Swiss-Prot record:
Gene Ontology cellular component list: mitochondrion
InterPro entries in UniProt: Rrg8 (IPR031415)
Upper classification of the organism: Eukaryota, Fungi, Dikarya, Ascomycota, Saccharomycotina
Protein origin, superkingdom: Eukaryota
Protein known as: Required for respiratory growth protein 8, mitochondrial
Function of the molecule: Required for respiratory activity and maintenance and expression of the mitochondrial genome.
Keywords, alphabetical: Mitochondrion
Signal peptide: none
Length: 280
C-alpha cells in the first residue's frame, strides 16, 4: 500500500479552504421590485384616493365637474349601505324599504310592539330594511317575522319575545302604498307650482299611455325648441288615477317638470314609487 506524506494532507486542506466559496450567515434580501408591491392598487382592487381642499382645487387640476350633487342616480347610489333582511345583501338604503319596530298605539292589541314600513327614512327606534318591491314582498310576507331588526334581537336590554311583535300581514303593503301615494301627490302638486323650462338633468313626470318604460333618459323640448336631456318618468305604471293629477297640475306641455336641486324629496319619492311597482 503506497504511503501518503503528511505534507500532502496539509496542502490539500489549505487549498480546499482557499478555493471554497464563503456563504454568508444572513443572505441579502433583494430589493422589492415586484409589481405585486410597487403596483399594489392595480391588482388588489383598491383605488388611490385623491384629497382636495375644496371644489375650486379640483377644477384647477382640469377635472370636470360632473354635478353629481344634482344627479338623481348618483345621490341614490351614494346613500349609506344597509343589509337587506331577505337576501342579506348590502345595498344603498335609498333602494330599500325601511321597517320600524316601535311600541303599539292600539290599546286593544295584545302585542306590545309592532313592525311596520315607513316612507321617510329616519334613525328613530330600531330599523331593518327589505327590498322596495311590491311583487317580491307579497311573496315573502308569510315569513315577515325574520324582518325584525337584528339590533333589537341581539340587544342585552331585550325585553320582548317574538310573539310580542305584531305584524299586520294583510294590510302591510296596502298601508305602505297609501302613505307613499299620499305623500307623493302632495309633493308633485307642490312642485308643479314652479313654472320651469326643462334643463339637462331635470325630471319630467308624465302619464304616457303609449309609453313602454317607467323611467328612461330621453330628449325633451325646452325654450326655442332646444332639445335637452331629461329623466322621463311614466306614472302609467303606478295606476290610472294618476292621469288626472298630471293633467290638472302640469307646468309644461310634457307634464310636471321637477328640478332635483329644488325638490330632492319629490324626485326620490317618485323613484321609490316607480321602483316599488316595477321591481320584480
Amino acid at each position: 500500500m503506497p504511503m501518503i506524506s503528511d505534507g500532502f494532507y496539509k496542502n490539500l486542506l489549505i487549498n480546499r479552504v482557499r478555493h471554497s466559496t464563503r456563504v454568508p450567515i444572513l443572505p441579502r434580501v433583494p430589493d422589492l421590485t415586484t409589481p405585486l408591491v410597487t403596483k399594489f392598487e392595480k391588482w388588489s382592487g383598491k383605488r388611490r384616493k385623491l384629497f382636495f381642499q375644496n371644489e375650486s382645487q379640483i377644477h384647477s387640476y382640469g377635472i370636470k365637474d360632473f354635478e353629481l350633487s344634482n344627479n338623481l342616480f348618483a345621490q341614490l347610489l351614494s346613500s349609506p349601505m344597509r343589509s337587506e333582511r331577505n337576501c342579506k345583501t348590502k345595498m344603498p338604503k335609498e333602494f330599500l324599504m325601511q321597517l320600524k319596530l316601535s311600541s303599539t298605539q292600539n290599546n286593544d292589541s295584545s302585542k306590545s310592539l309592532g313592525l311596520a314600513p315607513v316612507v321617510q327614512h329616519s334613525k328613530l327606534n330600531k330599523n331593518s330594511y327589505v327590498v322596495n318591491s311590491r311583487d317580491i314582498l307579497s311573496q315573502q310576507i308569510s315569513s315577515s317575522t325574520k324582518w325584525v331588526p337584528i339590533a333589537a334581537l341581539t340587544s342585552q336590554m331585550r325585553f320582548f319575545q317574538m310573539q310580542d311583535v305584531a305584524i299586520d300581514k294583510s294590510n302591510f303593503l296596502n298601508k305602505y302604498e297609501e302613505m307613499l301615494n299620499s305623500l307623493l301627490r302632495d309633493r308633485l302638486i307642490s312642485a308643479s307650482a314652479s313654472k320651469l323650462e326643462p334643463q339637462d338633468g331635470d325630471v319630467i313626470v308624465r302619464f304616457d299611455k303609449d309609453g313602454n318604460r317607467p323611467i328612461e333618459i330621453g330628449q325633451c323640448k325646452s325654450i326655442g325648441n332646444k332639445e335637452v336631456k331629461a329623466i322621463l318618468t311614466n306614472l302609467k305604471y303606478i295606476g290610472p288615477t294618476w292621469e288626472q293629477l298630471i293633467n290638472e297640475h302640469r307646468n309644461h306641455e310634457e307634464g310636471i317638470v321637477i328640478r332635483f336641486s329644488e325638490n330632492e324629496e319629490a324626485v326620490k319619492l317618485l323613484y321609490k314609487m316607480l321602483a316599488y311597482h316595477y321591481t320584480h
